[in-house]
From Swiss-Prot:
There is a cross-link at residues 73, 76, 83, 88, 159, 249, 701, 819, 837 (Glycyl lysine isopeptide (Lys-Gly) (interchain with G-Cter in SUMO2)). Keywords: DNA damage, Isopeptide bond, Metal-binding, Nucleus, Phosphoprotein, Retinitis pigmentosa, Transferase, Ubl conjugation, Ubl conjugation pathway, Zinc, Zinc-finger. Residues 1-35, 442-475, 511-692, 713-936 are annotated as: Disordered. Residues 588-597, 613-630, 637-647, 721-730, 854-863, 880-897 have a biased composition (Basic residues). Residues 51-374 are annotated as: Required for DNA-binding. A zinc finger (RING-type) spans 103-142. GO terms for cellular component: centriole; ciliary basal body; gamma-tubulin complex; midbody; nuclear speck; nucleoplasm; nucleus; photoreceptor connecting cilium. Expressed at highest levels in testis and at lower levels in adrenal gland, bone marrow, brain, colon, heart, kidney, liver, muscle, ovary, pancreas, placenta, prostate, skeletal muscle, skin, small intestine, spleen, stomach, testis, thymus, thyroid and uterus. Expressed in the alveolar epithelium of the lung. Expression is commonly decreased in colon adenocarcinomas and lung cancers. This is E3 ubiquitin-protein ligase Topors. Its EC number is 2.3.2.27. Changing residue 98 to A: Loss of phosphorylation but no effect on E3 ubiquitin-protein ligase activity. It is an enzyme of class 2 (transferase).
């Protein structure tokens, strides 16, 4: 064979033969091949072609060789070779572009030299044939070609290898979809034998612009519409084994829509059901095994089409970048992700996750879609989450789900809208862990709420346990998971405060331990009763057992009521809180070092108040226990109670009683005193009834004083007090009618007083707490028979130093205190005498300096707001400002007012301005409720009616009188008169448990002085005065029968 033709020379074709058309349908190419093969013997020799090409590149003539020669002359200077059979110009190929002895592909000598039909570049036939399987483009000029001329033995003797149509196309041509032989699919098999051409074989362009461009506002589809579609498509794309055949029927567009939905919903592949098989996807592996890259191409093409939509050029560019980087970087490397982020934007991580999942799986694309498991939809990238929760939890256990729902509903009812829920329904461990961790991040504003009710969490846990015990005994199916704790009580058992009060957190932990130990010591032998206050803890133990099988609604209601009533109970807490605030305690002393800020005082007060509430719960159970088993109470060594009482009087006790341990110590103290006094009273009358009365009164007194102590937190505390007291009257069920009536009347009177006297009382108490705090302790201890009746059990200690000034109203003079201590109590019954001495000794010893006017002024400056509740039933003032429960309790007040009046004992209270209304009612009830001492009514009446008609301005003016202490002498005289009146009360009054509470108020002084004529009118028209919203000084609180028994 002679010298081979130059590279640029085309093969000449037979004269009269039409030039071969551009690649079109398969039938046309077949006919062209047949014609070419049939006419090979008529072609001119390659030598003639070489000579023509040597002179100049010539256009193949469609007619004859002469035309070809003339055409060669025309393009002699152009050095271009036009494309045969087309109007497009071909790229120039220099004659010496490729050495004759080297193949551009294998860089070795030619083996079976072959020429491409378009550019006539020559290569080894085997090299270019394999090349065409990958890309049907010339390696040199990148022109696509359709056939290869090879085995050229003569000018007219050669063979033509026509490429199979399925291999036509290129990655860089968006109008063609390149397919590998190994990725045979239904669509490809159908298109190979279809005469429709490559247009029908390419991926159907989605109707939109792609998921990536939706976020840019090009086209947006609402996510909530896609979620149902997404779920349906998931079901379609994950058929069972029996339905695998149906997967083949899904059209390509449906698959693209499905994938688009996954990207919109943010649903990622969770796992692949691959049976433990997986592939290596490292860059080194792909470099060593380039054939493994082939399976990635179809998936990449589809996913990029989903993301970019009709932007085919972007699809090709990103696909090229990915395929190039796969062998450079690991798929999980940051470099790989960084190269794709400019293109995929916020979908980069999702795409990489899907890509890695597919690359690692052992399946092809179709099998991967079938075996992939997807997570629930995550929030959309651009739109954010439209649901309230980004976590979807599906519990397989229905019982656990129901219990969770109950707990969630319980928390949602709480007024505390903070993220720190009160886990009153959780177990003890949950309380410790959850609340402690939450408190570590709480700010100082939350500390007031947090530290105060640490033991209330203990009580909540105990209550939960007790409820479980009750539900076991009960035949109903209702299981109470927990109750909504008041806002102030939701704190953990172990309090760990942030930054500024870390020492306080550790201190409270220690105090909490002390509290628990003392509670356990008292609850030995009857742990089921004293461990916590059950829903029936306000009832006697006998009643509690009888009501063990009450319906679930009664159980739930009584539980809530008991929680609040017990939070108001426990006179022992009252005593401890008063002493804890008046005497230096570790916590109080720290607050003084911090500047004696109101917030600090109120915080400590709220803490002690909460703790006392918890122990009041405990004490309520204990009280019921004592009623059930009096022998146990009587058998308890009296010396032990006396010892405890004397120990609690210590200043060391008062220091320990601060914050959490304050309530525990007060528990022992009040319990010992109430037990001691109850034993004395039991000699002459029903001890248990009086015992309940003492607990009841002190519980209310504590509640009221607690409110006044936290005046700085008036908005918060007052609402809480109102809520707790208004609800507490439900659970105040007792065999003692006085117990019921008083609780009811106190609650209702407090609500009436709410509107007008709330602001007045707030302002008044701010001044009165400081000026009267010194005499408060004396008055409490040296009050009237009523004071002594309350105190006998030690319950009537003042809740805080804020209570000290109220007693000063009853006893502003030191002479009155000493007289009461020496002679006044000797005149009264002996059972009151011993208790009074204990109380007067305690207050006289610890507060001798408080009796002076100078000290009163100093207290006025240092004390926070105070309200003296000498009578045990006056928790109403603290709860008086509860607006939410106001209407509800007014209705109940009207409903039960008549019954309560007839059965209630005498309760005489000279109250602060805010208690005026409730005390008016009390006096009214005294007129209607059996034998009473007229002297008491005379003593109470002068201050009642005038106050009910007082205006806001008048009361505020009277505040000024109080602040100036202009009426101290007058107060002393009036109170001495009151004392005389109390001395004249016959033992019958004491046996009926008539209790006189003397409270100091400037308005009360003026009423005592100027309004003596109102006694008759008050007694004759008590019901008319009760509704007055301004009545805020005095009221006789009469309990009511709880209709829940």
């Amino acid at each position: 064979m002679g010298s081979q033709p130059p590279l640029g020379s085309p093969l000449s074709r037979e004269e009269g033969e039409a030039p071969p058309p551009a690649p079109a349908s398969e039938g046309r190419r077949r006919s062209r091949r047949v014609r070419l093969r049939g006419s090979c013997r008529h072609r001119p020799s390659f030598l003639g072609c070489r000579e023509l090409a040597a002179s100049a590149p010539a256009r193949p003539a469609p007619a004859s060789s002469e035309i070809m020669a003339s055409a060669a002359k025309e393009f002699k200077m152009d050095n271009f070779s036009p494309k045969a059979g087309t109007s497009k110009l071909q790229q120039t190929v220099p004659a010496d572009a490729s050495p004759d002895s080297k193949c551009p592909i294998c860089l070795d000598r030619f083996d079976n030299v072959s020429y491409l039909d378009r550019c006539l570049h020559k290569f080894c036939f085997r090299c270019v044939q394999e090349w065409s399987k990958n890309k049907a483009e010339c390696p040199l000029c990148k022109q696509p070609f359709d056939s290869i001329f090879h085995s050229v033995r003569a000018e007219d003797d050669f063979k033509e290898y026509v490429l199979r149509p399925s291999y036509n196309g290129s990655f860089v041509t968006p109008d063609r979809r390149f397919r590998y032989r190994t990725t045979l699919t239904r669509e490809r098999n159908a298109s190979v034998y279809s005469p429709s051409g490559p247009v029908n074989r390419r991926t159907t362009t989605p109707p939109d612009s792609g998921v990536l461009f939706e976020g840019l506002g090009i086209s947006t589809r609402p996510r909530d519409v896609e979620i149902p579609q997404f779920m349906r498509q998931i079901a379609v794309r994950r058929p069972t084994t029996a339905d695998e055949r149906s997967l083949r029927k899904i059209q390509e567009q449906d698959i693209i829509n499905f994938r688009r939905t996954l990207y919109r919903a943010g649903a990622r592949v969770r796992n692949i059901e691959d049976g433990g098989r997986y592939r290596d996807i490292s860059a080194e592996f792909f470099r060593r095994n380039p054939a493994c890259l082939h399976r990635l191409v179809p998936w990449l093409k589809r996913e990029l089409t989903v993301l970019f939509g009709a932007h085919g050029s972007l699809v090709n560019i990103v696909q090229h970048i990915i395929m190039s980087n796969v062998t450079r970087y690991d798929l999980e490397s940051q470099a790989f992700v960084s190269d794709l982020r400019p293109f995929l934007l916020n979908r980069t991580e999702h795409f990489i996750h899907e890509f890695i999942s597919f690359a690692r799986s052992p399946f092809n694309m179709a099998a991967f879609d079938q075996h992939a498991n997807y997570d629930c939809p995550a929030p959309s990238y651009e739109e954010g989450s439209h649901s309230d929760s980004s976590v979807i939890t599906i519990s397989p256990d229905e019982a656990e789900t129901q219990e969770l729902d109950i707990n969630v509903a319980t928390v949602s009812q709480a007024p505390w809208d903070d993220e720190t829920p009160g886990p009153s329904y959780s177990s003890s461990e949950q309380v410790h862990v959850t609340m402690s961790s939450l408190l570590n991040t709480s700010d100082s504003s939350d500390e007031e709420l947090v530290t105060g009710g640490a033991t209330s969490q203990i009580q909540g846990v105990q209550t939960n346990d007790d409820l479980n015990n009750d539900s076991d005994d009960s035949s109903d199916n209702c299981v109470i998971v927990g109750f909504v704790k008041p806002l102030a009580e939701r704190t953990p058992e172990l309090v760990e405060l942030s930054s500024d009060s870390e020492d306080l957190g550790s201190y409270e932990k220690m105090e909490t331990v002390k509290t628990q130990e003392q509670e356990q010591s008292y609850s030995s032998g009857d742990s089921d009763v004293s461990r916590c206050s059950s829903p029936h803890s306000v009832l006697g133990k006998d009643e509690q057992i009888n009501k063990g099988h009450c319906d679930s609604s009664t159980r739930i209601k009584s539980k809530k009521e008991e929680k609040r009533s017990t939070s108001l109970s426990s006179p022992r807490n009252l005593n401890s809180s008063v002493r804890g605030d008046r005497v230096y305690s570790p916590y109080n002393h720290r607050h003084r070092k911090r500047g004696r800020s109101r917030s600090s005082d109120s915080r400590s007060q709220s803490r002690s108040g909460h703790d006392q509430k918890n122990h009041r719960k405990h004490h309520g159970k204990k009280r019921m226990k004592s009623k059930r088993s009096r022998s146990r109470e009587s058998s308890r060594p009296r010396g032990r109670r006396d010892k405890k009482r004397s120990r609690t009087r210590d200043s060391s006790w008062s220091r320990r009683s601060q914050t959490l341990s304050l309530s525990s110590e007060s528990t022992s103290r009040s319990r010992s005193r109430s037990s001691d006094h109850g034993k004395r009273r039991s000699r002459s009358r029903n001890r248990d009834r009086y015992y309940l009365r003492n607990n009841y009164g002190s519980r209310y007194k504590w509640e009221y004083t607690y409110y006044s102590r936290n005046k700085d937190r008036d908005g918060y505390e007052s609402s809480y007090r109102r809520r707790t007291l208004s609800r507490a009257h439900y659970s105040r069920q007792s065999s003692s009618p006085e117990f019921r009536v008083q609780s009811f009347s106190e609650r209702t009177n407090a609500r009436k007083k709410n509107n007008h006297s709330e602001r007045k009382y707030y302002y008044y108490e701010r001044h009165r707490s400081r000026s009267l705090s010194s005499n408060r302790s004396r008055t409490a201890s040296t009050g009237t028979d009523r004071v002594r009746n309350e105190k006998p059990g030690g319950k009537r200690k003042y809740k805080t130093r804020h209570l000290e000034g109220t007693n000063e109203v009853a006893q502003p003079s030191r002479e009155f205190a000493s007289k009461a201590k020496d002679s006044h109590y000797q005149k009264s019954s002996s059972k009151l005498d011993g208790n009074y001495k204990n109380e007067s000794d305690t207050f006289s010893d610890s507060r001798s300096s408080d009796r002076e006017t100078k000290h009163k002024r100093r207290k006025r400056k240092t004390r926070s707001l105070s309200v003296e509740i000498v009578y045990e039933g006056k928790a109403t003032d603290t709860t008086k400002h509860h607006k939410k429960k106001k209407k509800k309790h007014k209705k109940k007040h009207k409903k039960h007012h008549g019954d309560n009046a007839s059965r209630s004992p005498v309760v005489i209270t000279i109250d602060s301005d805010s208690d005026k209304d409730s005390e008016v009612k009390e006096d009214t009830e005294c007129d209607n409720s059996g034998p009473q001492d007229p002297l008491q009514n005379e003593f109470l009446a002068p201050s009642l009616e005038p106050f009910e008609t007082k205006d806001v301005v008048t009361i505020e003016a009277e505040f000024g009188v109080l602040d100036k202490e202009c009426d101290i002498a007058t107060l002393s005289n009036n109170l001495n008169n009151a004392n005389k009146t109390v001395d004249n009360i016959p033992p019958l009054a004491a046996s009926v448990e008539q209790t006189l509470d003397v409270r100091e108020e400037s308005t009360f002084v003026s009423d005592l002085e100027n309004q003596p004529s109102n006694i008759v009118s008050l007694q004759t028209e008590p019901s008319r005065q009760l509704p007055s919203p301004r009545t805020s000084l005095m009221s006789v609180c009469l309990g009511r029968d709880c209709d829940m028994s």
